[in-house]
UniProtKB/Swiss-Prot annotation:
Modified residues (N-acetylserine): S2
GO cellular component: cell periphery; cellular bud neck; cytoplasm; mating projection; nucleus; plasma membrane
Sequence ranges assigned to domain Protein kinase in this UniProt record: 76-360
Residues reported to bind ATP: I82, G83, E84, G85, S86, F87, G88, V89, L90, K105
Catalysis: reaction(s): L-seryl-[protein] + ATP = O-phospho-L-seryl-[protein] + ADP + H(+); L-threonyl-[protein] + ATP = O-phospho-L-threonyl-[protein] + ADP + H(+)
Organism listed in the record: Saccharomyces cerevisiae (strain ATCC 204508 / S288c)
E.C. number(s) listed in UniProt: 2.7.11.1
Protein name in the entry: Casein kinase I homolog 2
Alphabetized UniProt keyword annotations: Acetylation, ATP-binding, Cell membrane, Isopeptide bond, Kinase, Lipoprotein, Membrane, Nucleotide-binding, Palmitate, Phosphoprotein, Serine/threonine-protein kinase, Transferase, Ubl conjugation
Function: Casein kinases are operationally defined by their preferential utilization of acidic proteins such as caseins as substrates.
InterPro entries documented for this protein: CK1_Ser-Thr_kinase, Kinase-like_dom_sf, Prot_kinase_dom, Protein_kinase_ATP_BS, Ser/Thr_kinase_AS
Other known facts: Present with 6160 molecules/cell in log phase SD medium.
Length: 546
């Protein structure tokens, strides 16, 4: 699921922010600049829609039997698939009681790192917080965990793409102010986010009061940084594994240090510069593997001066990043000071935070439109392909040749190269066609081997005609994957059984090729057996049976 927010700016005075004056309570926001005596509509967070379900608590019990398999949680009807990611699959849905749209997240129950249950708990903690979607249901349906929450609009990343991968300073300032407020509210609930990125900030749905309000979603990485009752901060640690998105994560996170509130604030600073510049200096770095790539990104961040990053931009953005990078591990960020610092940018430009954003100017002033900006992504609302960088490159240097001889020679070379490339392509296509035909023949043979009844083949052929965005198609894919996993496990078990000797021990090697243990190995094995016997006797003696 995906989303959006509004930015803020600051003055060239390099406004100093005293981080020591902040306490752990929410700061007073009365100093935020007002338009005509009121906060701009875009800076208000509207309350979540009431779905009138009677009880919004999630159900942990298994699904009840129903005639309609497209209904989950008793009254949420599954619509089309609108997104897919590492967590699972996202569907559009409808609350059948009141007809309001919802988002339904599916996560395989046997996934290695399940997140939906933790995410549901976080939504419960944040219930009623402005800019946080309301949760309606959590439970198990078949092979999946399911979470039902508010359906929102596109993400800031989507809008960034639609706007040509560059936001105006005014838009960035207004978005930044909203982002800071959202993270402040999260921190006030004793949580840190740990995965700040544009994809996780969404705007509302069109036609709603919060259509341009920024929301925060996807709390799978969120973590408590202090005890909710005692307010005792977690201890500082090092050698921690990386959590978050490398492009935006803080320098301390790259260094393996425990994350706290300061890391969320620094990651937001990187997002602000991403919106202003179009890309960050540490994007596109190459490395043999991810570990080395993350190290190179972290090193580039350390070596890049914040004011070099802000060159040609309002200096307040560089000042913000400098301040938050100097926060101590347990220090409370000065959220209000940061908002005022960034809003001062608008004062310098003679602008106001009036709730006007770049994406509102799209399509002749009609704003973003899914019928035009249409390419499904993780959040369901898509963005067009990024600008083609190759198209911006200059033409080949061969155009500098002006004489006919040069042109003729160049054209001959080009024709020869094209002919060679065409011949190679035809040869490759022929090989691929042969391989495809062989694979299809083998698949057909396997199908009739496993399912000699023609009716099964007809059902499979009919099922393949399903709409790929439908829930039925997703169910079919899930069942096929599950069947393949089961078949794989059975094959592994059969192989293991075939290699098992009479004493039940697995013969890892062919009988004639069994390795012989030397004296040192025999002594080591004997010692292990003695220790095992001692431990087992000790266990049973506690039960009084030995």
């Amino acid at each position: 699921m995906s989303q959006v927010q509004s930015p803020l700016t600051a003055t060239n005075s390099g406004l100093a922010v005293n981080n020591n004056t902040m306490n752990s309570q929410m700061p007073n926001r009365s100093n935020v600049r007002l338009v005509n005596g009121t906060l701009p509509p875009s800076l208000h967070v509207s309350s979540n829609l009431n779905h009138n379900t009677g009880n919004s608590s999630a159900s942990y019990s298994g699904s009840q039997s129903r005639d309609d398999s497209t209904i989950v949680g008793l009254h949420y009807k599954i619509g089309k698939k609108i997104g897919e990611g590492s967590f699972g699959v996202l569907f559009e849905g409808t609350n059948m009681i009141n007809g309001l749209p919802v988002a339904i997240k599916f996560e395989p129950r046997k996934t290695e790192a399940p997140q939906l249950k933790d995410e549901y708990r976080t939504y419960k903690i944040l219930a009623g917080t402005p800019g946080i979607p309301q949760e309606y249901y959590f439970g198990q349906e078949g092979l999946h965990n399911i979470l039902v929450i508010d359906l929102l609009g596109p993400s800031l990343e989507d809008l960034f793409d639609w706007c040509g991968r560059r936001f105006s300073v005014k838009t960035v300032v207004q978005v930044a102010v909203q982002m800071i407020t959202l993270i402040e509210d999260l921190h006030a609930h004793d949580l840190i986010y740990r995965d700040i990125k544009p994809d996780n900030f969404l705007i509302g749905r069109p036609g709603q009061p919060d259509a341009n309000k920024v929301h925060l979603i996807d709390f799978g990485m969120a973590k408590q940084y202090r005890d909710p009752k005692t307010k005792q901060h977690i201890p500082y640690r090092e050698k921690k594994s990386l959590s978050g998105t490398a492009r935006y994560m803080s320098i301390n996170t790259h260094l393996g240090r425990e994350q706290s509130r300061r890391d969320d604030m620094e990651a937001m600073g990187h997002v602000f510069f991403y919106f202003l510049r179009g890309q960050l200096p540490w994007q596109g770095l190459k490395a043999p593997n991810n570990k080395q790539k993350y190290e190179k990104i972290g090193e580039k961040k350390r070596l890049t001066n914040v004011y070099d990053l802000a060159q040609g931009l309002p200096i307040q953005f560089g000042r913000y990043l400098e301040i938050v990078r100097n926060l101590s591990f347990e220090e409370t960020p000065d959220y209000e000071g940061y908002r005022m610092l960034l809003l001062s940018v608008l004062d310098d430009l003679g602008e106001t935070a009036d709730g006007q954003y770049d994406w509102m100017k799209l399509n002749g002033g009609r704003g973003w439109d899914l019928s035009i900006n249409k390419k499904p992504n993780l959040h369901g609302y898509g963005h067009p392909n990024p600008p083609n960088e190759k198209s911006k490159r200059h033409r080949s240097k061969n155009h500098q040749y002006s004489s006919p001889d040069h042109h003729h020679h160049y054209n001959q070379q080009q024709q020869q190269q094209q002919a060679q490339a065409q011949a190679q392509a035809q040869a490759q296509a022929k090989v691929q066609q042969q391989q495809l035909q062989q694979a299809q023949a083998q698949q057909q043979a396997n199908r009739y081997q496993l399912q000699p009844d023609d009716s099964h083949y007809d059902e499979e052929r009919e099922a393949s005609k399903l709409d790929p965005t439908s829930y039925e198609a997703y169910q079919q894919q899930t069942q096929q994957k599950y069947a393949q996993q089961q078949q794989k496990q059975m094959q592994q078990k059969s192989k293991q059984f075939a290699n098992t000797g009479a004493n039940g021990q697995t013969n890892k090697y062919p009988y004639n090729a069994q390795p012989t243990a030397n004296d040192e190995q025999n002594a080591k094995n004997a010692a292990q057996d003695r220790n095992s016997n001692k431990s087992s006797k000790g266990f049973f003696s506690k039960l009084g049976c030995c």
